Amino acid sequence: MNNTVSEFSCQLDDLTVTEAMGEALGAQLKAGDLVILTGALGAGKTTLTQSLGVGLNVREGIISPTFVLARQHPSLGDGPGLIHVDAYRLKDHDDVDTLDLESTLADSVTVVEWGLGKVEHLTDSRLEIQLDREALAAPVGNPWEEAEEELDEPRLFSLKAIGPRWNEDAFAQLKDSLLSAVAAQRTEEKHV
């Protein structure tokens, strides 16, 4: 097994840049890809998944699957569908296996929020994405008193690509696409 690991990080200035990143990411993914999202509440995991769905061209209506654990979003075109999982309440591999993600993995892109340490056994290649608002934000008030405007704060996007699917060429193409989307969104915002 090829355990190629490549990494990069960049700042996402606000939610529109986060959305541009997600859309570019979705456009690069294909059936069989596994994406593990990590970050505190309000870090932008669901926002990133929603825009990733736009890039994949799947049916709208992506919301956090907190209470149902997994939601399926079919493709509107020729591409793969999206399986969106919230693994927060799942304890381990056994709990994950009850969702039977193996049966949809080959035909879909699978995005798992809170999945680190729980879903890596599903495939030998994956993307691990960490979204962190705290790394860039100045301390403000009480964390439980989160104002709506604080949701639009900058966040640090860190991506780790693991396995043979993300060889040097595939990773370089992914990274270039993501950074180009961020740069284009920043340029657009400057001209508005």
Task: Spell out what each predicted region is.
Residues 61-66, 71-116:
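Conserved nucleotide-sensing/catalytic segment adjacent to the nucleotide-binding pocket
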